[in-house]
Amino acid sequence: KKDGYPVDSGNCKYECLKDDYCNDLCLERKADKGYCYWGKVSCYCYGLPDNSPTKTSGKCNPA
């Protein structure tokens, strides 16, 4: 398992305002839990499966 910022198919993080939104998003991706990291206004997940995509150094390419 790993921790990190979940990303969509374009390697873009999920913006957020509420922890509930991120927790649900992370649970859908089979993580243990998640929250909205205010410093980056992005969802952060704990305990994601190793094969779940997370933010890397690549650029965000919105669909």
Curated annotation (Swiss-Prot):
Residues 2-61 form the LCN-type CS-alpha/beta domain. It comes from the Eukaryota. Belongs to the long (4 C-C) scorpion toxin superfamily. Sodium channel inhibitor family. Alpha subfamily. Its main location: secreted. It is found in: Secreted. GO terms for cellular component: extracellular region. PROSITE patterns: LCN_CSAB. This is Alpha-toxin CsE5. Keywords: Disulfide bond, Ion channel impairing toxin, Neurotoxin, Secreted, Toxin, Voltage-gated sodium channel impairing toxin. Expressed by the venom gland. Alpha toxins bind voltage-independently at site-3 of sodium channels (Nav) and inhibit the inactivation of the activated channels, thereby blocking neuronal transmission. Signal peptide: none annotated. It comes from Centruroides sculpturatus (Arizona bark scorpion). SUPFAM superfamilies: Scorpion toxin-like.
